[in-house]
Amino acid sequence: MPKPILVLVALISLSPLVAFAESHPTPAKATDITNEEVDAVLKKSLPKEDQQLKVVDVGPYNLAVGIIHREAAKDPTDGITSCLAHHNVTETYIIRSGSGTLVTGGHIINPKEVTGDSDINIKAVGPTASGFVRNSEAQVRHVKPGDIVIIPADVCHGWFGITDHVDYLSNRPDPDRMLPAGYVNPSIK
């Protein structure tokens, strides 16, 4: 292929990337989420409720940070744990307080898509399936404050063995920009 045509093909194929970069410039400032803000949201959240703190446009993708509070949960008697799998969003859990058993991976039994108009789809993690997983086919680990677990998109995850509670932050990179950039939890506006 002649050099001028090769250069033209390269420029045409790169133009969408340039347009995207121009429409999503890298932010010029940091975003803070204080411990007091996290505590304020936790005080108003219901047990097992996932609360998005903020969703920030960080240039090439959105980044969301949520806080989740889970109440006591007994060990399953049948070796099966309920689970969720978020199709497009990876999560990083950072355990703040309490402890429990986190189950990840395995094959989802009886998967059902969460309705598209639910808060979990719109504000928290995008399209999600719920179901069950056999603990014997999954990774099972006890987590405590300071532990960090990275859960890739479409990996099911669920909890049991929570003796009192577990509170954890969830960092959620959103490369598809499904979550609403600029969102701030009403409790901390």
Stretch-by-stretch model annotation:
Residues 133-138:
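Short alpha-helix capping/helix-loop boundary micro-motifs
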Residues 20-87, 183-189:
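A short, N-terminal "cap"/entry segment at the start of jelly-roll beta-barrel domains
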Residues 87-106, 116-131:
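Short, conserved beta-strand element in jelly-roll/cupin
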Residues 83-85, 91-94, 140-141, 148-149:
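His/acidic/aromatic-lined binding-pocket segments of jelly-roll/cupin-type domains
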Residues 164-182:
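A short hydrophobic beta-strand segment most commonly corresponding to one strand
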Residues 7-16:
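Bacterial N-terminal signal peptides
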Residues 142-163:
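Conserved metal-binding segment of the jelly-roll/cupin
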